[in-house]
Amino acid sequence: MNKWHINKWYFFVGMLVIFAVIISLILKDTSLTFSSYDREKFPHLIGNSMVKKPSLAGRLKIIEIDGRKTLGDQHGNPIQLRGMSTHGLQWFPQIINNNAFSALSKDWEANVIRLAMYVGEGGYSTDPSVKEKVIEGINLAIKNDMYVIVDWHILNPGDPNAKIYSGAKEFFKEIASKYPNDLHIIYELANEPNPTESDITNDIAGWEKVKKYAEPIIKMLRDMGNENIIIVGNPEWSTRPDLAVNDPIDDKNVMYSAHFYTGSASVWENGNKGHIARNIEKALENGLTVFVTEWGTSEASGDGGPYLNEADEWLEFLNSNNISWVNWSLANKNEASAAFLPTTSLDPGNGKVWAVNQLSLSGEYVRARIKGIPYKPISRETMGK
């Protein structure tokens, strides 16, 4: 072999080595993005062993572990609920079908679904038939081994004592009579108390008005023999569970809701805990239990984003504190927080599940986070071409 061939051979080997190094670095970066990123920076995003189904966990109750109260199962062990919320059932009733609930339970591995029954905006107050969708949804949740949150969705006006919401007690009485002490059901009494067209102020006085509304309903449910978990909203669109610290509701199975949207509120703000995360921590540190019954990957409007890095920070915070959560929303609306693309049917088909490319960016992300698997987004560059 002459000198020219030797040099050519060394050049060829050298290029192979360089190529191998480049490939290994690419693979390493991919691993960091899809696996080590989740496990090292956010260790509580991977795994869902605490996300137990009703058939295993049974009746829910508040328990105390190491001096802090949290949600527990019938055996006294901690449990976390993860799942999805419907959008307004007056707008997206098509999601109430067995194929959808089956896909959420089996493919997404959700153990809870929230049925958002708006009262205003074309909801229950003007169209009582929307209640039938709630009943149908409860039946499907039970059939598909999920807990179900019955959400009295107040929003506009923001005072749960307003005349438009006067049917609340009778509504919950009817549901409780139809499903007496059913272990699957969680009652959410007031979605988001707020100052819109109301005097629900962002302070103790505002909380007292919410409490005044909630207590008679809670007493009625307990007098009927229902031991179910009951969730109560709080001022400023359910971002102030801390306001109940000095005057909590006297009931052993009451939880306080917290809502946030990752494009509008961060866990960390200027190196310190953000205001909503801080409010949640204060509630927990003072003996209350918190359930995030609504959060979105978008801005608070439901659109913009999705803000997935911020979502990772939030879910790490929630999972590490065993706080249950429900994502907004099961809709094919053209907005960032919707779980499905506008072209996707809310019925995946008999015996079928939604393909990942039928999900929005938010839906794809949240599905992975409910399942507790690494988030590996598909390429969307060629979709629709």
From Swiss-Prot:
> Can you state which reaction this protein catalyses?
Endohydrolysis of (1->4)-beta-D-glucosidic linkages in cellulose, lichenin and cereal beta-D-glucans
How's its activity regulated? Activity is enhanced by 1mM Mn(2+), but is not affected by 1mM Ca(2+), Mg(2+), Zn(2+), K(+), Na(+) or Li(+). Activity is not inhibited by EDTA (in vitro).
Record-annotated active site = 192 (proton donor), 294 (nucleophile)
Q: Which residues form a coiled coil?
A: none
What does UniProt note on temperature dependence for this protein?
Optimum temperature is 70 degrees Celsius. Retains about 85% activity after 24 hours at 65 degrees Celsius. Retains at least 50% activity after 4 hours at 70 degrees Celsius. Rapidly looses activity at 75 degrees Celsius.
Q: How activity varies with pH?
A: Optimum pH is 5 with carboxymethyl cellulose as substrate. Retains 80% activity at pH 6, and about 50% at pH 7. Inactive at pH values below 4 and above 9.
Q: Which UniProt keywords apply?
A: Carbohydrate metabolism, Cell membrane, Cellulose degradation, Glycosidase, Hydrolase, Membrane, Polysaccharide degradation, Transmembrane, Transmembrane helix
Top-rank lineage group of the source organism? Bacteria
The terms under GO molecular function for this entry are: cellulase activity
Q: What is its main location?
A: membrane
This enzyme's EC code(s): 3.2.1.4
Database matches in SUPFAM superfamilies: (Trans)glycosidases
Q: Where do the annotations place substrate binding?
A: 87, 91-92, 118, 153, 261, 300-301, 328, 333-335
Record's function text: Thermostable endoglucanase that has high activity with soluble polymeric substrates containing beta-1,4-glycosidic bonds, such as carboxymethyl cellulose (CMC) and barley beta-D-glucan (in vitro). Has no activity with cellobiose and filter paper. Has no activity with substrates containing beta-1,3-linked glycans, such as laminarin. Likewise, lacks activity with xylan, galactomannan and pectin.
The entry describes its oligomerization and partners as: Monomer.
Q: What is this protein called?
A: Cellulase CelDZ1
**Source organism:** Thermoanaerobacterium sp
Q: What is the gene called?
A: celDZ1a
